[in-house]
């Protein structure tokens, strides 16, 4: 049996070229002012939809989604603070982080002491602009560098936020790639942050390129890519797609996977789901500095997929963990913070995880009484791989453990050998009549 698709190998080739393309796509998306609703997320989905087939869904304001309701739609055109000289001291056109995301419209004049309660800064990083939101409480405000605050004169200011908060809809995008099985692999990433590169243009770009990589291939599983607003988007999708959710067999939430930090994988609520084991195995061999974290109900949209009513096998793949790096939710999470090499490596890791899941099967040894004589079949020598001894060991491990009950991932975990070399061994032994696949039919 030939490997279905060498995704990991494909992503590894021309890593520099692939990384440059990923970074360029992030650069194109970076200027857009996104939020959990509105034209910013629509524009973002439109750009993703030029690269992969994307179905757009609009869910009206007020729609009940479990214990929540779809919020009003927010759009912004301009915002500024200017002094009596009509010069803007804070300008939304220079950074869309300057406005408290979801601010209600305001246009008034006020003295500095009245304005200050509406200003947000990071004193410990005085040149950085914070990212703040007020999704579910109507308010307005500006986020500015602390040095900007210190430079404000005690005078009257004109304050303008040219925005709308009114009935509309919540927007999300889906890319569905059918496989032989109706069982699904889910890839989810939040698309609601404005000009923040690692969180989460990294996830959006890698997911888009991953869908391109999978598109047109002969797939075992069907794949569903979700580009959604954080929290409320996942809740909305789950409330509208309970039957679809029941078909999810593996899943990854992708976030903050473009910085230079080590990989972190947060396990699903199930703790030992196949995707948890697959991610841990790939990271062990591809990124030895990676850490596997236990499940926690704090984080990204894995919180919703892993809620007890669904309890889906969905983990979260990151590099630096949210909230642990100073650039998190600040203007320092910019395109310079995003590494082209890291993006390419993240794409390769994701592809390798899915390659493992696609090829993880159980086999039956057709010559189970003592070892079959490999030499007379030409199987007791290397086929030209980088580790001849490992190739022989892989064949012996696969033969010994192929009792119809152990999968290749089981064998990989027990032997310490990379999954890929065991999969190659299983294919070779199958071609020589020594193994038979025993997996039940899919879908």
Language-model region placement:
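N-terminal hydrophobic/helix-forming segments and targeting peptides
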Residues: 1-443
